[in-house]
From Swiss-Prot:
Disruption phenotype: Normal phenotype. Drastic growth defects like ectopic meristem formation and sterility when associated with the disruption of RING1B. Homodimer or heterodimer with RING1B. Interacts with CLF. Component of the PRC1-like complex, at least composed of RING1A, RING1B and LHP1. Residues 32-64, 287-306 have a biased composition (Basic and acidic residues). It comes from the Eukaryota. This is Putative E3 ubiquitin-protein ligase RING1a. It is an enzyme of class 2 (transferase). Pathway: Protein modification; protein ubiquitination. Putative E3 ubiquitin-protein ligase that mediates monoubiquitination of 'Lys-119' of histone H2A (H2AK119ub), thereby playing a central role in histone code and gene regulation. As part of the PRC1-like complex, repress class I KNOX gene expression. PcG PRC1 complex maintains the transcriptionally repressive state of many genes, including Hox genes, throughout development. PcG PRC1 complex acts via chromatin remodeling and modification of histones, rendering chromatin heritably changed in its expressibility. It catalyses: S-ubiquitinyl-[E2 ubiquitin-conjugating enzyme]-L-cysteine + [acceptor protein]-L-lysine = [E2 ubiquitin-conjugating enzyme]-L-cysteine + N(6)-ubiquitinyl-[acceptor protein]-L-lysine. The RING-type zinc finger domain mediates binding to an E2 ubiquitin-conjugating enzyme. InterPro entries: RING1A/B (IPR044592), Znf_RING (IPR001841), Znf_RING/FYVE/PHD (IPR013083), Znf_RING_CS (IPR017907). Residues 1-10, 326-336, 366-384 have a biased composition (Polar residues).
């Protein structure tokens, strides 16, 4: 008989941490005790059955034992086969479940476009929509021989991007991202293959794009016709406005026609009177000049007659034009006379704009400004001519006497040693008085193909009143250089031509003669 074992396994022992609240519950403790008792009874029954089975096996005969062993082996084999089949079925079910899960995941990952692509092998593509994606940003044409910028992945034609990089633009033309050199460019044959598949003939496609279609031609004709109609309407409206403006101007000017005709008649009468008086003065002057040698008394009579006529004219003009009385006092100063006349005539006719630069008709038909000087006083042509001559003389005197006027100096350049240095093809020059000798030396050096430091400019040394022709001087050689120093004077760089003209040119000479030679080393 086996000893009854009342021990418990670790799984059967209740954990105090799992049941903290049942420790102080009496009902929970009773339940545990009942469970333990039932377990002990079951274990005891099993042990009893086991002991009985062992006793039966000992009593059974050997033959029976062998038969029982064969039956047990067959049963075990059948059980093993059933278990193997069940395992295989379970594995197959697991594999099927895994495949279904994978298919579900693949279906989730797939997009609608891929599903449609699986359904149909080919897609319809509109080339107009893809045109922008295959366009070169530089030439705006379809990309040929694609090159991709590695920094930004923008694509260009090979010729376009190479030309841009040669010009020194080390940046992407599309996004202005810096590119170090052409090494950052890569060919893209796959993109070229895609373009070749989409556009079989790129040149013909671009020609079709550039060509005008019939609809566009009709639309352009309509636009041109509408523009022509609008321009015609505008021109007609402008013509109408001009005609209306002219009619209004004629209506406004009609009251002034009578006054204008009177002024014209008065002006004509005054011009005729002035011309006749001037003619009489000229005749009297000629007669007086002819008889001056014969009789001195005729001069006195002529002067008296002229004075009387001038007094008559001045009195008549003062009565007709009181504003011009002050202007007759001085015929030489035309600007003062003009200003005085305009100041006086402002009160007479305030409707006119009295600007000395604007020609206007004054009272009695006389002009406020004439072509040559002031003629408002009706002076003779001889007095006007004398005033003009006086003005010209004064201007010439001021220009000659003034220090600001500088005349050009005529210079002649001559070579002292014609064997070494030839004469210039154009030796005569016209220079400014402020020109320096240094600048002239640079010019000579440039003409004879020498350095500026190797050229020396000389001028004849002479006393006042003496003239020396430098053209007649003998050729200077290194042996005679010391002797020529006494006759010639070397010029400094800071000297001006005006100073040389005063010191080295005589009154009857027309040119300042300057010689040049190669500077001699001592």
């Amino acid at each position: 008989m086996s000893v009854k074992n009342n021990s418990f396994s670790s799984a059967e022992i209740p954990d105090v941490a799992d049941q903290p609240r049942d420790r102080f519950n009496p009902e929970a403790t009773q339940d545990l005790q009942e469970k333990d008792e039932t377990k002990e009874e079951k274990e005891g029954d099993e042990e009893v059955k086991h002991d009985e089975a062992e006793e039966d096996q000992e009593v059974v005969k050997p033959n029976d034992a062998e038969e029982d062993d064969d039956g047990d082996d067959a049963e075990e084999d059948e059980e093993e086969e059933v278990e193997a089949e069940e395992d295989e079925e379970a594995e197959e079910e697991e594999e099927e479940e895994e495949e279904e899960e994978e298919e579900e995941e693949d279906s989730k990952e797939r997009s609608p476009s891929s599903i449609s692509g699986d359904q149909s092998e080919f897609m319809e593509i509109d080339l107009g929509e893809i045109r922008k994606d295959v366009q070169c940003p530089i030439c705006l044409g379809i990309i040929k021989k694609t090159r991709t910028v590695m920094e930004c992945l923008h694509r260009f034609c090979r010729e376009c991007i190479d030309k841009s990089m040669r010009l020194g633009n080390n940046e992407c033309p599309a996004c202005r991202k810096h590119c170090a050199s052409r090494r950052s460019l890569r060919d893209d044959p796959k993109f070229d293959a895609l373009i070749a598949a989409l556009f079989t003939n790129i040149d013909s496609y671009e020609e079709e794009e550039l060509a005008f279609h019939e609809d566009e031609m009709a639309r352009n004709k309509q636009i041109q016709a509408s523009i022509a109609q609008i321009s015609q309407r505008q021109s007609e409206a402008l013509v109408k406005r001009r005609s209306l403006g002219k009619e209004a101007a004629v209506l406004m000017r009609s009251p002034r026609i009578a006054s204008g005709s009177r002024r014209r008649r008065n002006s004509r009468n005054m011009e005729q009177q002035n011309a006749s008086e001037a003619h009489e003065d000229d005749d009297n002057d000629d007669n007086n000049n002819r008889g001056r040698d014969k009789d001195s008394s005729s001069d006195e009579r002529g002067t008296e007659v002229r004075q009387k006529k001038r007094r008559k004219r001045s009195t008549s003009r003062s009565t007709q034009h009181p504003s011009s009385s002050g202007a007759n006092k001085n015929n030489g100063n035309c600007a003062d006379n003009d200003t005085e006349v305009y100041r006086d005539t402002k009160g007479i006719s305030p409707g006119l704009v009295w600007n000395p630069e604007i020609l206007a008709w004054g009272r009695g038909g006389t002009r406020s400004n004439t072509r040559h000087g002031n003629n408002t006083s009706g002076g003779s042509s001889k007095s006007v001519r004398n005033a003009r001559v006086n003005k010209l003389v004064e201007y010439l005197r001021s220009s000659v006497d003034g220090s600001s006027v500088e005349l050009d100096i005529h210079v002649k350049l001559v070579s002292l040693d014609t064997k070494c240095i030839p004469d210039l093809p154009q030796p005569y020059l016209c220079c400014r008085p402020t020109l320096l000798v240094k600048q002239l030396r640079e010019f000579v050096a440039l003409q004879i193909h020498l350095k500026t430091e190797e050229v020396e400019l000389l001028v004849t040394r002479r006393r006042v009143g003496e003239d020396a022709a430098i053209e007649n001087l003998p050729a200077v050689t290194p042996a005679s250089a010391a002797a020529s120093k006494d006759e010639m004077l070397s010029l400094e760089d800071n000297e001006t031509l005006s100073r040389l003209k005063i010191d080295f040119i005589s009154s009857h000479e027309q040119h300042l003669i300057i010689a040049y030679r190669k500077k001699q080393t001592e």
